[in-house]
Design a protein with these regions (language model features):
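Conserved HGGG/HGGXW glycine-rich cap/lid loop of the alpha/beta-hydrolase fold
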Residues: 10, 15-69
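Active-site loop/oxyanion-hole signature of alpha/beta-hydrolase fold enzymes
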Residues: 59-98, 102, 276
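Conserved hydrolase catalytic core segment
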Residues: 93-137
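Flexible "cap/lid" loop of the alpha/beta hydrolase fold
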Residues: 121-161
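Alpha/beta-hydrolase
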Residues: 154-219, 225-226
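Short beta-strand/loop motif that positions the catalytic acidic residue
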Residues: 224, 230-232
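Conserved alpha/beta-hydrolase "acid-adjacent" motif
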Residues: 237-243
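Catalytic active-site module of serine/aspartate enzymes centered on a nucleophile-bearing elbow/loop
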Residues: 254-286
């Protein structure tokens, strides 16, 4: 997790160790939740955009990756509890929550369990809270966007994963192969960050804990009073209809912003789009 100029580090004591984070800015407080699960924090540019839009941002490395604790459990309940621990440590009673991908799903979980703590949610390229949230089509969509050689190498790595012989280098390479496919224009995609870190154990346990809570989450979202704006690219491999639109359809105070020609990282592919969506979220919350 790289600190931007002006960001101040903090640590929150939680079961198993600490959660490490960064905060900066003046204005309404916003908690940022990164994607994954089991990935290093990567929302520096998004935090900067939101601070320029008038928010004070707090972002943290979710457990499973240093400098936060690498101890489990890594299930949804624990990740939600860690987020609340960050709010409590910071003395933040009510916040805007901005989540990306898996982090958007965590934001939905927070809104369903602690609506009194959330002023509103901006869910960017999010895994949805209805059905499987679009998860089942993500892998096939990514593989369809890379070349034959990439698909063949990806299949070889998957075989090693299934056999239990995959290395950490295999995990990084697997993400590197599909990384360009997350973007609306794969040829123009930036390189995979050199400091990316992955925890397969965290990712697997977190994902496995989603399905058992699916029915409760969908029921809770249907009556959730928290306003939410979904910001989603029409070329996101995490399909818009199965994720953002399906979830918005069951929520009483939800809107969807569709970005043409944009993939999974709107703030990188179309700078300013998250700040624009924030304006709509504030209006929805009034």
């Amino acid at each position: 997790m790289r600190a931007d100029p002006g960001e101040t580090p903090f640590e929150v004591t939680v079961p198993g160790g600490v959660i490490a984070g960064l905060r900066a800015g003046v204005g309404d407080p916003a908690l940022l939740l990164h994607g994954g699960p089991g990935l290093s924090e990567h929302l520096g540019e998004l935090a900067d955009e939101l601070r320029h839009a008038g928010l004070a941002t707090s972002r943290f490395q979710q457990r499973g990756i240093a400098p936060s604790t690498v101890e489990g459990p890594f299930d949804v309940d624990r990740h939600v509890a860690d987020a609340i621990a960050v709010l409590d440590f910071s003395g933040l009673q009510r916040v805007w929550v901005v989540g990306h991908s898996w982090g958007g799903y965590l934001a939905l979980q927070l809104a369903s369990r602690y609506p009194e703590r959330i002023m509103g949610v901006l869910a960017i390229g999010t895994l949805g809270g209805v059905g499987d949230g679009g998860a089942s089509s993500l892998g096939p969509n990514l593989l369809a966007r890379i070349d034959d050689a990439g698909r063949a190498e990806s299949a070889e790595i998957e075989q090693r994963e299934e056999a239990g012989t995959a290395s950490y280098a295999d995990e990084v390479r697997s993400l590197e192969l599909v990384w360009p496919a997350y973007f609306g224009d794969p040829a123009a995609a930036p390189p995979l960050p050199a400091d990316i870190a992955i925890s397969a154990a965290c990712g697997e346990e977190a994902v496995a804990s989603i399905e058992p809570d699916a029915e409760r989450l969908e029921r809770s979202l249907a009556t959730c009073p928290v306003p939410i704006v979904f910001l989603h690219g029409d070329l996101d491999p995490l399909e818009l209809e199965a994720s953002a639109r399906a979830t918005a359809a069951v929520m009483p105070r939800a809107e969807v912003i569709e970005l043409a020609g944009v993939g999974h990282f709107p703030w990188l592919e179309r700078p300013g789009s998250a700040a624009d969506a924030l304006v709509k979220l504030v209006a929805l919350a009034i």
